[in-house]
Regions:
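Soluble "head" domains of membrane/secretory-pathway proteins
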Residues: 3-4, 11, 19, 23, ...
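Sec-dependent signal peptide cleavage junction
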Residues: 24-30
Length: 166
């Protein structure tokens, strides 16, 4: 009985940590340069699993095969999306991408490449900020919301990047 009383607090802590990491928040590591310069290779971010209301330009973690990739939501369900002359057009209107550096080049692209006029309900178009070095929706197609693990907008490590991701 004494043993149970001694170990019970530790078991409760372990269960709470497992529940929090499974359903609420968990750390995730950036692997590669596809989000550079916004995020660096090896950076550790906090993934909010509970937040399922995705907005344009949110940084999200996507399950792609057996890996997790960090990308930015560019297109929402119902959007017609294309890039022409390094400019993003959504539903025919030019949209600014303030998070991109002036040197970033985005090759021409049209969502019609996938034989769709607009992004279907429950799907999103994601891209890396480092457009010439990113495996994203231009290659893998639109991403179902069930494959988006959550939003990540807070950097934990390295410590010089600690804080809200812009």
């Amino acid at each position: 009985m004494k043993f149970v009383k001694e170990i019970a607090p530790y078991l409760i802590i372990i269960v709470l940590v497992v529940l929090i990491r499974t359903f609420i928040i968990t750390p995730v590591r950036v692997d590669g340069l596809s989000m550079y310069p916004t995020l660096k290779n090896g950076e550790i971010l906090l993934l909010k699993k509970y937040d399922r209301s995705f907005d344009r330009f949110d940084i999200v973690v996507v399950k792609y095969g057996n890996t997790k990739i960090v990308k930015r939501i560019i297109g929402l369900p119902g959007d017609n999306l294309k890039f022409v002359n390094n400019k993003l057009y959504i539903n025919g209107k030019e949209i600014e991408e303030p998070f991109l550096s002036a040197s970033v080049i985005t090759n021409d692209f049209d969502i019609n490449k996938f034989n769709i006029d607009k992004i279907p309900d429950g799907y999103y178009f994601v891209m890396g900020d480092n457009r010439t070095n990113s495996t994203d929706s231009r290659i893998i197609g639109v991403v179902p919301s069930k494959n988006i693990l959550g939003i990540t907008d807070f950097s934990l490590f390295p410590f010089n990047t600690f804080g809200k991701v812009k």
